[in-house]
Structure formats: structure tokens, C-alpha cells
């Protein structure tokens, strides 16, 4: 008879971290009525490398407002897209990736329309997204979670991954895909897509304020008790 190992203790750690972050920061919710269409979330992700969220929001909204739909954006020359993406940290890279991504969707689907993903299991939908130019695990998870799809996937940005590595929840050298594969099986089963989204936003906030890339402020970090690095710093 196989031995039951019981629940993974890291699941309870995630619950404690979440509770501590809520106490420190309060709720960071994305109201359902403010969820964007998946195509918008995809564009936002593809152009957003190393760019503040507010700037990427503005760029994505401006493109859709000017051109009316993403098919028209795909038809624009890279140079003209680059001029419109000047808010982005790397406008040329953003423009090149965006055009390639949108053109690939049109080649495969006839237009920039991701509605077919709603009929696929989440893992299959993410795998399809990750075949597109410029799309990795962070973006595919974002499209499935933060859009109107509202699936139980976890966006893992640089802040999130760094915190989980320092806490020894995921392997120290894990890339985004490996960190995702380590985290999703231990996400509390009762968490909804909105809960998972909020967990990511709380960890992002922590990474911007306490668990910074350099000189983290471990002594006053709200999750220090569940972080191997924070506990060691306090010893």
C-alpha cells in the first residue's frame, strides 16, 4: 500500500504569506468588470518588457484607440509601431515582437481573436500561446488569469520569482517556467483565479518595497518568518 505523504507544507506557507501581505498592504483586487479582453492582455505582455505597468497600460490603450482593432495594428510597419511605443523601455523590440506575434495569430486563426482558447484546457491554451513570438510563461499565464478568461494560473514576474527563490519555495536557479511548475501544484485549492491574481499583485508589491533585488529589507519584511533568507538574516 503506497505511503501517503500528506499535504505539501509549502501550501500552508503560501497561505501564511498571503495573510501577512494582506495585513501589511490591504486588498489589491482586480474587479471583474475591469478585466480586459485576452487580446489586450496579450499585447500588454508582449510590449511590456522592463516597463512600468502604467506605461504599458497607456501604450496598449493608445494602440487600440487609434487603430480600432488588433488586425489593423498588425498591418502597421514596425517603424510606425515603434514610434507609437515610445513609452516602452525598448520600443524597437516591443514593436518587432508585437508585429510578429499578431501576424502569427492572423496566419493561424484568420484574425487576432483568442476566443478559441476558452474551449481548451488551461494547460493546452497556455502551450498554444507559448508558440507565439515573444510569449513565454509569464505572458501565457497572464492572458489566462488576468483577462476575462479568469483561469487559475499564476503570473510570475521577476519580483515574484525572486521572493519565492529567497524563501526557498522554488529552486534557487528556477526560470519562470520552472518556478510556475513548482508553484502551481502547491497553490491552495480554495484559491480562485482572483485570489491567485491578488497573491501575485501582493508579492509584486513586496518585491518593490522590501524584497528588492539589492539590499532587501529583511528585518521588517512581513513574510520574514516564512522566508529562509529572512530567517537567516535575523539569526
Residue spans of the language-model regions?
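Catalytic cores of DNA base-excision repair glycosylases
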Residues: 2-235
Amino acid at each position: 500500500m503506497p505511503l501517503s505523504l500528506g499535504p505539501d507544507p509549502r501550501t500552508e506557507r503560501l497561505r501564511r504569506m498571503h495573510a501577512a501581505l494582506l495585513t501589511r498592504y490591504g486588498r489589491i483586487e482586480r474587479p471583474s468588470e475591469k478585466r480586459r479582453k485576452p487580446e489586450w492582455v496579450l499585447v500588454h505582455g508582449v510590449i511590456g518588457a522592463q516597463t512600468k505597468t502604467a506605461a504599458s497600460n497607456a501604450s496598449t490603450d493608445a494602440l487600440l484607440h487609434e487603430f480600432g482593432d488588433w488586425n489593423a495594428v498588425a498591418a502597421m510597419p514596425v517603424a510606425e509601431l515603434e514610434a507609437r511605443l515610445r513609452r516602452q523601455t525598448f520600443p524597437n523590440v516591443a514593436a518587432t515582437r508585437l508585429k510578429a506575434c499578431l501576424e502569427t495569430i492572423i496566419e493561424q486563426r484568420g484574425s487576432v481573436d483568442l476566443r478559441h482558447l476558452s474551449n481548451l484546457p488551461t494547460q493546452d491554451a497556455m502551450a498554444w500561446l507559448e508558440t507565439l513570438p515573444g510569449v513565454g510563461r509569464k505572458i501565457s499565464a497572464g492572458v489566462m488569469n488576468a483577462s476575462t478568461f479568469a483561469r487559475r494560473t499564476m503570473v510570475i514576474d521577476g519580483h515574484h520569482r525572486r521572493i519565492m527563490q529567497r524563501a526557498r519555495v522554488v529552486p534557487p536557479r528556477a526560470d519562470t517556467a520552472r518556478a510556475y511548475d513548482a508553484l502551481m501544484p502547491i497553490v491552495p485549492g480554495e484559491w480562485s483565479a482572483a485570489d491567485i491574481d491578488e497573491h501575485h499583485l501582493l508579492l509584486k508589491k513586496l518585491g518593490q518595497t522590501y524584497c528588492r533585488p539589492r539590499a532587501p529589507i529583511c528585518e521588517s519584511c512581513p513574510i520574514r518568518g516564512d522566508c529562509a533568507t529572512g530567517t537567516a538574516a535575523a539569526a
